[in-house]
Amino acid sequence: MKILFPLILTVILSLSAFTAKAERLVLVGASYGKNIVAITDAKGDVLWSHKTAGPQRGHTGHHDVHMLPNGNILFHDTWTTLKEITLDKKVVWQYDCANSNGNKGKRVDVHAFARLPNGNTRIVESSVGRVIEVDKDGKLKHQFALKPGGTTSSRWARATDKGTFLVCSERPGVVTEYDVKDGKVVWDYLINTRVYGAMRLKNGNTLIASGSGNSVVEVSPEKKVVWEIKGKVPGTEVNLKWMTC
């Protein structure tokens, strides 16, 4: 602990200094061989990092990561295991989707999750095809099924300001908005690509990162495309490839 304390203090002081100057920090999940979660400054200099499990334990990608209000970091160490760690890398919470709440023996992988204001954790279980909410002890508090017909191949998911939940499904390439209380579909948009990310904007439109479509699209509630960038970014030499948000 004598070794760790100066390091932790340095990280905290660094983060505080950046916060005081209103400079942006970036939380990074680097995977597919990198296997690291890190906090960097706007220049890319690493202020803090944590090595993760990596392919040797069946995990090849960090598809979601969050810094929590308490300063801890919530990430997934394998396709099925979520962990919350402190800046001194102590695991303070862990949940294994593969062996919990009826999933044993089933194929399940996780690409999206979030800590809720009530302290529970919402997890989207791809393949199993459901969204669950578990408490700090891993007890199932709420769940609803994803829409049948291919939407169980879920990727990124995010809550809206209305409290509904946007879930992206690579196949059949659709963004679906659910009422989290009963799992009813309240809106969807078929983009016909391996769509990866979507978020609801303040104006009520939905920004969609099309994944394999190499594009970013803004659509209205009436499902009309109001803005789009595809392929090459106008006025630059930047070519869009696999897109997420």
Regions found by a protein language model. Give the residues of each.
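Generic early N-terminus positional signal peaking at residue ~5-7
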Residues: 5-6, 151
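Bacterial N-terminal signal peptides
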Residues: 6-16
